[in-house]
Amino acid sequence: MKDVNLLKTNGVDVDKALELFGDMEIYNETFQDYLNGIDEKKSNLAKFKNLANWADYAIFAHSIKSDARYLGFTKVAEVCLKHEMAGKEQNQHFIETDYDHLLKTVDGMTDIVKRYLAGEQAGSNTKTPTQDSDIPKPAVSTPTINIPKESVIIIADDSPLIGNFAARILEPTYKVVLTQDGKQTIDLIEAGRYNVETLLLDLNMPNVGGFEVLEYLKSKNIQVPTSIITGEDSKDMINKAFTYNIVDMLVKPFSKDELLRVVEKTKNYNL
C-alpha cells in the first residue's frame, strides 16, 4: 500500500499535483511513466552537454522540468528551469558548474518515486527494495501508432509522462495515438491511416520540433484541427505559433479540466 505521506514529508506538493491529475489513481500511474522515461532523458542531457549542443540540452532540461512540475516536485522543477534557461542562453559556465547539482536533485526525485511505488511508509528507517516486479506497469504504452482506428486524437509530446496522462483522461471517450517527436507525427499523418480529429502538438521537442510540423501542415495544405502544448515561459514561441492556423493552447502543467476543454474546442473547430 502506498503512503502519500512519504511524498509530503519529502516536500512533494501532492495537493497541487492532484489539481492537475484529478485523482490518486491517475497520479500513481503517472509515477511509473516518469520512471520509464527518466534514464533516457538523463542520457540525452549528458549527450548534448558533451556535444555543447545547448539548444537540445535545454529541450531535455525542459522535459524533466515538466515532469517534476506535474508530479509536485516544485524544487526539482526550479533547478531544471535554471538549466533550461542556461541552455537557451548558451551559458556553458553555469551548466558545467551546476550539472552535478542537477543530477543529484533529479536522482533524489527518482529515489523518492521508487520508494513511494514500492510501498515504503513515511518515517520508516528502512528503505524498501525497489524491484522492477514491485512497480506497476503503465496503463498506456508509447508510442501507439500501430493501432488502427478510424478517428483519433494525436498527442505529440516527447514526455511519456505527459502523453500518457492525457491519454488516460481522454481514452474513455476518444481513441488516442501518442507520438514523441515531429517526425513520428508527420509520418503518421502522411500514412493516412487515420481521420485525425485533433492534434495536440508540443512545440518544444527534440529532432523534429512542433514548428516543423506546423510548417509541414501549412505547406501541404493539410487541414488538421491543431492546438499547441507549451511551457508557461515560452511567450515568444506562443506568438510565433499563432501565426499558423491553430485553435488554442495548453500551458504546462495543464489540468484534466483544461485538457478536456481544449480538446473539445479543437475537435469542434471549423477549419
Question: For each predicted feature, which ranges?
Answer:
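Active-site beta3 strand of CheY-like receiver
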Residues: 193-200
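Acidic catalytic/metal-coordinating carboxylates
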Residues: 180-184, 208-212
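Short amphipathic alpha-helix used as the core "switch/output" element in two-component signaling
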Residues: 187, 211-223
